[in-house]
Design a protein with these regions (language model features):
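Bacterial Sec-dependent N-terminal signal peptides
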Residues: 1-14
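Conserved SGNH/GDSL esterase-like catalytic core that processes O-acyl groups on lipids
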Residues: 16-21, 26-115, 151, 271-273, ...
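Alpha-helical cap/lid subdomain in secreted, periplasmic
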Residues: 46, 72-210, 453, 458-595
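Low-complexity, Pro/Ser/Thr- and charge-rich linker/hinge segments at domain boundaries
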Residues: 217, 227, 290-312, 319-323, ...
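Surface beta-strand/loop "capping" patches
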Residues: 218-219, 225-231, 579, 583-627
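Extended acidic/polar, glycine-enriched regions
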Residues: 235-314
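Short, conserved helix/loop micro-motifs enriched in His/Cys and acidic residues
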Residues: 331, 336-373, 475, 479-484
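C-terminal beta-sandwich/jelly-roll accessory domains of carbohydrate-active enzymes
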Residues: 614-697
Length: 697
């Protein structure tokens, strides 16, 4: 029985419609002070009103498996549910089947037992409406999470879906309202009163089809930019089973139907980049209209504070920074509170817990000083340079960096559960994140230290800032982050590939990712090795060691401030990103060049040794630097490095005197945390920090 039949029952039934909630301790309301008032079935009753009667038939510890340690079909609640003869059944079982006494022994019987349970409940009337629920979450703090529970949980979730599909039953997933809210599951299993309310609202929507009507992602708005050059996916929310109509420019119409969860999605034809468009979305008398919509290339700019640094905070604002350009646009996601050294007030803490850390925002054009001054300086200069080189292509930047954020906050909870689950529990007190990150988070949540979320929490910013962008369409990603992870490069080496996979799965398969190498600062000696790690994490075809493709790196050590982690000069960073993008993504020649040094050979010529890499002379860009070349360190067999100033001949070729060049075995370039290295390629891009062997030819 679907939504149409339900509407008929509501209209004509003399008796209330009976809804039986079948389940375990989560349904029963275990740990709640007043289950008769706070459990999700009790909340559901209040939401549904007098036309319904909701029965709570949950039994703590119950298993779906008939041979489990506490089979639901042997519990008194099962007999009561049979006798009650409900019109609708909502079944939520399986959590206790993850127990090692159950799933490893009887997994093959789960499907049979689930079908038998459904048949028993509906034997008087096989047409009764049955909704089966995939399980509410088990969090990483569960005592058996790492010893089988997560694997069993995933297998049971998949089996429940197969059962629903085979019987053509309505399927809901009670992980959806709770998954990114671990603080609402204090014992890893059972929801708090607030968690039960979230569950009840979700089940209410599934029962009635009332999902609040037509709504769209906040990304949709006047002035938005959609990715050009391909069909565009438009997705949104409506009431369950509703017809949705989309009009594009009044001459194209597209239709979709929402599913029982109110979700709908459609593909529309690609849009012209030459003019603006209007998109109108309608459903059940509701109407949303978006004007001045462009098709262009959409880039995500993310990371931490050096990406977040605003244009009006920099020292290299140029007059073109405020040049009017309606076809350069940004969707700037800014936090409701900066992670400064302060205790956040209660209202901020509540919003953070509710995943409302980003302010409401709207699309902006580069036409007003007050707009562009608030943009990320790096992102603005990147977009400005692309617009100058691609005048026929609108460029849009979606900006969501957060100052101080560690990389793990941008990795999904799901990915961390399956790879680094220990990071998800008591993260404030574990050394995965650098001490500054953990201490700053504790300062921010000092007024509510228990059960409080923070944007630095592993997985938080993925759920808050990345996942909501799913399906929107992007050209590529700019990533400037690492300051908060540089003290643990071995962990970053594990996390960065996970982030790449998450971003690409969410935002677009094989999207190019352009990373910014950390600049330099005297007080952070660990940055030397971290910068080299960042090079290793680029793609193999770029000279790195990462098998993931399309990952590129821009050096910035020459833009550094020896005393400030936030260099105030951002023009070069954004411009270099744009030039690298023009070369790699847009295949423009003579934009960026080669910046990677490999092993070096020394070729003797009289009293000099010339430096050769990859078969060619290493040359300086004489238009930028005419004197000695700084930044090289050499070592003999003892492995002790010493700095050397290299000279250049009239052709810019680098050489060193024979007295210095004899007996060398290795070199480093631009290695110190703060360096004045000054070797540039022919396009004015600094050569990346490097180390390698030296041989003689």
């Amino acid at each position: 029985m679907g939504l149409a039949c339900l509407a008929s029952l509501v209209s004509y039934a003399a008796e209330p419609i009976k809804v039986a909630c079948i389940g375990n301790s989560v349904t029963a309301g275990y740990l709640l002070k007043d289950p008769e008032w706070e459990s999700y079935p009790s909340v559901l009753q209040r939401l549904l009103g007098p036309n319904y009667e909701v029965g709570n038939f949950g039994h703590s510890g119950a298993t779906l498996l008939f041979k489990g340690h506490r089979p639901y079909v042997q519990m008194p609640e099962f007999k009561k549910a049979l006798d009650w003869d409900a019109d609708i059944f909502v079944i939520h079982l399986g959590l206790n089947d993850t127990d090692p006494r159950n799933w490893p022994n009887y997994a093959s019987e789960f499907k049979r037992d689930y079908n038998a349970l459904i048949d028993s409940l509906t034997h008087k009337n096989p047409m009764k409406r049955v909704i089966i629920a995939q399980m509410s979450p088990i969090t990483a703090s569960h005592s058996r999470f790492r010893t089988g529970t997560l694997q069993y949980f995933d297998e049971i979730q998949a089996e429940i879906k197969r059962i629903a599909d085979a019987r053509n039953l309505e399927l809901i997933n009670l992980s959806d309202p709770l998954y990114n809210y671990a603080h609402l599951l204090p014992d890893a299993l059972h929801p708090t009163s607030e968690g039960a309310i979230r569950m009840a609202r979700y089940v209410y929507g599934s029962l009635t089809g009332d999902w609040g009507g037509l709504s769209m992602s906040p990304y949709y708005g006047d002035g938005m930019v959609l990715q050009r050059g391909k069909k565009i996916r438009i997705s949104g929310q409506a009431d369950g089973g509703a017809r949705v109509t989309v009009h594009v420019d009044k001459d194209r119409e597209y239709l979709a139907m929402s599913n029982h969860l109110g979700k709908w999605s459609m593909l529309i034809d690609s849009l012209s980049t030459e003019r603006s468009h209007s998109i109108t979305i309608m459903s059940k008398g509701q109407r949303l209209q978006y004007n001045n919509v462009l098709a262009g290339d959409v880039w995500l700019a993310s990371g931490q504070s050096n990406m977040a640094w605003k244009l009006n905070q920099t020292k290299d604002q140029r007059r073109e920074a405020y040049r009017d350009d309606d076809r350069l646009r940004a969707y700037v996601m800014q936090p409701i509170a900066e992670t400064n050294k302060t205790a956040w007030p209660e209202d901020i803490l509540t919003q953070v817990n509710n995943h409302q850390y980003y302010k409401k925002t709207s699309w902006q054009t580069a036409q007003h000083l007050e707009n562009t001054g608030q943009w990320s300086a790096v992102a603005y200069h990147f977009g400005r340079a692309l617009r100058d080189s691609l005048p026929d292509v609108p460029i849009a930047i979606v900006c969501n960096p957060i100052g101080g954020a560690p990389i793990e906050s941008f990795v999904s909870q799901r990915t961390l559960e399956h790879n680094l689950p220990d990071m998800l529990t008591k993260w404030y007190d574990k050394p995965y994140s650098m001490p500054w990150v953990r201490e700053r988070a504790k300062e921010n949540i000092a007024l509510r230290p228990q059960g409080q979320r923070h944007p630095y929490e592993p997985g938080y910013l993925y759920a808050e800032g990345i996942e909501p962008l799913h399906g929107l369409g992007f050209k590529g990603i700019l990533w400037y982050q690492g300051e908060s992870n540089a003290d643990n490069p071995s962990l970053y080496k594990q996390l960065f590939p996970l982030l790449v996979d998450d971003f690409r799965q969410t935002l677009g398969k094989n999207l190019p990712i352009y990373t910014v190498q950390l600049p330099g600062i005297s007080s952070r000696p660990e940055w030397s090795e971290f910068r080299l790690l960042q090079e290793d994490l680029t793609s193999i075809e770029e000279g790195g060691k990462n098998a993931q493709k399309n990952i590129f790196l821009v050096p910035t050590y020459d833009c550094a401030d020896s005393l400030d982690v936030h260099p105030r000069y951002k023009y070069a960073v954004g411009n270099r990103l744009a030039r690298l993008v023009l070369q790699k993504t847009y295949h423009r020649e003579q934009a960026y060049g080669q910046t990677k040094l490999g092993d070096i050979s020394l070729v003797r010529h009289g009293k000099k040794y010339y430096l050769i890499s990859d078969g060619t002379f290493i040359k300086q860009n004489q238009a930028l630097v005419k004197g000695d070349i700084q930044g090289f360190e050499f070592a003999h067999a003892d492995g002790v490095y010493f700095p050397v100033s290299l000279e250049q001949d009239k052709k810019g070729r680098l050489f060193v005197s024979r007295a210095i060049g004899d007996g060398l075995v290795s070199y480093r370039y631009a290695y110190p945390a703060y360096t004045k290295a000054n070797l540039y390629n022919q396009y004015g891009i600094p050569v990346l920090p490097a180390f390698g062997r030296i041989d003689y030819k």
